[in-house]
Amino acid sequence: MKGIRRNLQKSYLKRCSEMYLRGLKVSGEIVSAKGIYLEAILPFANIGNEVEIQSNSRRIRGEVIGFSGDKVLVMPYEPVFGLRKGDKVLLKNELVSTKTGNGVVGKVVDPFGNPLDGGFIGFVEEKGLELPQINPLYRERIREVFDTGVRSVNALFTLGKGQKIGIFAGAGVGKSTLLGMITRHSKADVVVLALIGERGREVKEFLEEVLGEEGLKKSVVVVSTADQSPILKVKGAISAVVHAHHFASQGKDVLLLMDSITRLALAQREIGLAAGEPPTLKGFTPSVFQLLTRIAESCGAFKKGSITGIFTVLVEGDDISLDPIADSLMGVLDGHIILSRKRAVRGLFPAVDPVRSLSRLMPKLVSEEHFMKANFFKEVLSKFEDVEELVRIGLYKGGSNPLVDKVINNLEKVESFFKQKPEEKVNFEESLKALDEIYSLLK
């Protein structure tokens, strides 16, 4: 009996091999379903190949994510409800791709470049959904300031074109609002915004209230919502990088925004665990940290164009040291803007923490005078922070520290430096002027 089964298997594989070599589509079948992925017999499948699962009532797209013995692991893009053992799996000979080009600017699209409103898109081209490998010698040094349009960021944590930075904060502190301000007010030629794992309700709110009509005009918005397959969330992030590199290759300065890279990590963890990877810190698999590093490294200044990356990072319990994703990204990125819940409660929006935030490239981008004034301001704020509670309950003794006394005497002006309405734009020159005024008050 075993001999008959072995001969049938050899005959099947030979027939599949002939079909594959002749360019015909090879098919197999589902043999089991395990949670969010399927096991199938599918000869000649490669990791990353797209497949189509055909049942009596549905056609579901999916992707090969790994192997287990002689079986192929398939992650469907849609829920597997209604599929059954023996359903046909058709191997597509091409890798997964997305539509990109000028036709998607001003559009809200899925990870494959299809407009979510079902409308028409103009000229586009197909590009594979894979992260680029960038020759380090093709990169240029980052020398030019990137104007975010946000006063506190421009003045105290100046960014450069091609820099990658994270916005770190707990839930509800204003990450998305700050991201929307930078989207609307920055001087980027094209903005690529990836909304990964957002609730469906929040997507519409973000587009209308945070991004706005003006922000959308120069943006490509890639959406993969919380209720979708984890592989679609990962594809959404990769799709955003593909769009960004397409426009950068045309010599444009691109701003790549991702909200949030934490949800991307959670999605990749699901895929990694399903594929049999060993869990490490808090269940995160090795592929999570590799993916985050590759996403971050896709940014930079190139011989043609640049990609400036800003990623929101959801910090568990507002403590970066206890969050493996936040802690890992601190070492991968070129700086961090930390939002403070304490400042948010006091109505200081954007709630940027001036003492803990940092741009590693700032010393190479600004004048010595600018850098000195920014450091002085942060040093003074650090000293004030040490005694702030005493000041607010009336136990601080005036004269203990002359610099702290100056902050107390000018506290309203100091706090107004950080306050900025979402619709208010403050360019780089205006930000420097505001810093000069604060410096003259405190010096």
From Swiss-Prot:
Q: What is this protein called?
A: Flagellum-specific ATP synthase
> According to the entry, what is the taxonomic lineage of the organism?
Bacteria, Pseudomonadati, Aquificota, Aquificia, Aquificales
Top-level taxon of the source organism: Bacteria
* Localization per Swiss-Prot or TrEMBL: Cytoplasm
Entry-linked PANTHER family:
ATP SYNTHASE, SPI-1 TYPE 3 SECRETION SYSTEM ATPASE
Q: Which Pfam families match?
A: ATP-synt_ab, ATP-synt_ab_N, T3SS_ATPase_C
Which keywords belong to this entry? Answer: ATP synthesis, ATP-binding, Bacterial flagellum biogenesis, Bacterial flagellum protein export, Cytoplasm, Hydrogen ion transport, Ion transport, Nucleotide-binding, Protein transport, Translocase, Transport
One Gene Ontology biological process: bacterial-type flagellum organization
One GO cellular component from the entry?
cytoplasm
Catalysed reactions listed for this entry:
ATP + H2O + 4 H(+)(in) = ADP + phosphate + 5 H(+)(out)
